[in-house]
Structure formats: C-alpha cells, structure tokens
C-alpha cells in the first residue's frame, strides 16, 4: 500500500508525506521544527519514522524547516544541485545530490524527480511508485509543459496545485510585480491550467485528486470545487482539498480509485 498525507499546503508552509509499509518520505518542510513536530503529531507520525526528506526547491515555504527537521529525524536530504547552491540547507545532517529527471529508490519506494518550470534554481516535483501504485506531487509550476503532462499520466493519486483564480489575482491586493510573477510561466498554476491538465489525461485521469497550494487570497476551496464539478461527475473522480492549516490526513486508493482513509 502507498499512502499520502499533508500537514499543511500553501504559501505559508508546505510539507507532504508519502509512505509504504516500510518507508516514510517527507517532501519539503516549510515549517519551523517545533511547529512541524506538532503538525506531525496530528497525523500520528513520529519524527523518527521519517526515512528521508526530498526537497522540491529552495523557496522558504518549502525548505525553511528542512535542515532542522533532518537533524531531528536523523534523515538524509535529497535535493538537486541547483537547490543545494542556494545555501539554505547549511547545517543539514546528510545530503544526497540528485539529478533532474532522474529515477532512484529510497527503501521500497521508487522516486522520479520531474523538472518543472518555476522561478527557482533547479526545481523538481516528484512521482512515487510502490507495488504498482503511483502517487504524484505537483505544485509550484507556472505552466504544464508536455514533459510534465507525460510524467504524471497514470497516477492513482495526484496532489495538484490549484493556486489561484486568474481574475481574482488580477483584481486582488498583490503588487503588480507579484501578480506578474504568480501568473507567469515560471510562477504558479491557476485553476484553469490545473483543470486543463486533468482534462488532457482523458481516461487516465487519477481516481483521486488532491487540490493543493490553494491561495488564501486569490481563490477558495469553493471556487475550485465549482470548477471541478463537471469533471468530478464525468470521470467519477474523488477530490480532496488540502488546507494551509491542516493539510489532509492519510489517504490511499485501491485499483478502482476508491479513497480510503488510513492510519
């Protein structure tokens, strides 16, 4: 069984966990160590259970707590060369440099590091495989390139960024430069882009989609839910919404795509 959980998803901090029966992986940690311990407790995870930490990129909402949590967990950090050159992992326990678009294994979980367009030094996102089950984690990208589209085909569960409603962003309070950054090709996916990615998958659309990195200023769970409504009915797809405050509890899915909450 392969399962996934999050202790928070959004611009104030991100941390996602993917686990098999034998291996527990943490993807990013944008929370201070003490806060992270409290958040892990909410999903019944002991920090010592974390076998490795995979970093997507060097922005503080993803990397801010990684070095401290690595030391506390005694877990190695996996990151690209570009991410390592940011200097934000100083004091980390053990670092393993990975290549973009590479495949490797940690314990009994196979990992693919996928290059994505984002305004960071060498950003990647990840696909995880175990016992014929695939979980994709895909946030912090400004567009869905053909390469990204192909890499995430055939996932059973997909954590996908629905960052902003473009109209809400344009009329919102952000400075003009930040609006251009967020909406640009190296920024964040807007809701329509994320929906378009799912629709392009056709019959291979994941049975379960987790909408994540939802901006608290520029969209809402209700807006994303309304947008996804027709696809949910047509594809009989399960949708879960990751929040900034709590993320989402452990879930897995069976071959039919049915969602199960797991401890």
Question: What positions do the PLM features span?
Answer:
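Active-site neighborhood of phospho(di)ester-bond hydrolases with catalytic His/Asp-centered motifs
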Residues: 27-30, 50-58, 78-81, 136-140, ...
């Amino acid at each position: 069984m392969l399962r996934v959980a999050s202790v928070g998803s959004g611009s104030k901090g991100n941390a996602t966990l993917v686990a098999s029966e034998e291996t527990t992986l943490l993807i990013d940690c944008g929370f201070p160590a003490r806060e992270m311990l409290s958040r892990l407790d909410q999903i019944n995870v002991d920090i010592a259970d974390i076998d490795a930490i995979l970093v997507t990129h060097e922005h503080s909402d993803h990397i801010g707590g990684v070095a401290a949590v690595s030391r506390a967990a005694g877990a190695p950090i996996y990151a690209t060369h570009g991410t390592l050159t940011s200097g934000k992992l100083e004091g980390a326990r053990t670092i393993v440099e990975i290549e973009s678009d590479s495949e490797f294994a940690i314990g009994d979980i196979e990992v693919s590091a996928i290059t994505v367009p984002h305004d960071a030094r060498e950003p990647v996102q990840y696909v995880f495989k175990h016992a014929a089950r695939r979980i994709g984690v895909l946030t912090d990208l400004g567009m869905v390139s053909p390469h990204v589209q192909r890499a995430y085909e055939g996932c059973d569960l997909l954590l996908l960024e629905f960052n902003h409603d473009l109209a809400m962003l344009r009329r919102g309070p952000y400075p003009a430069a930040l609006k251009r950054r967020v909406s640009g090709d190296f920024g964040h996916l807007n809701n329509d882009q994320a929906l378009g990615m799912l629709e392009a998958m056709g019959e291979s659309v994941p049975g379960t989609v987790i909408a994540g990195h939802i901006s608290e200023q520029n969209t809402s769970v209700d807006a994303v839910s309304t947008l996804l409504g027709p696809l949910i009915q047509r594809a009989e797809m399960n949708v879960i919404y990751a929040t900034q405050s709590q993320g989402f509890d452990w879930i897995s899915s069976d071959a039919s795509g049915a969602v199960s909450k797991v401890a």
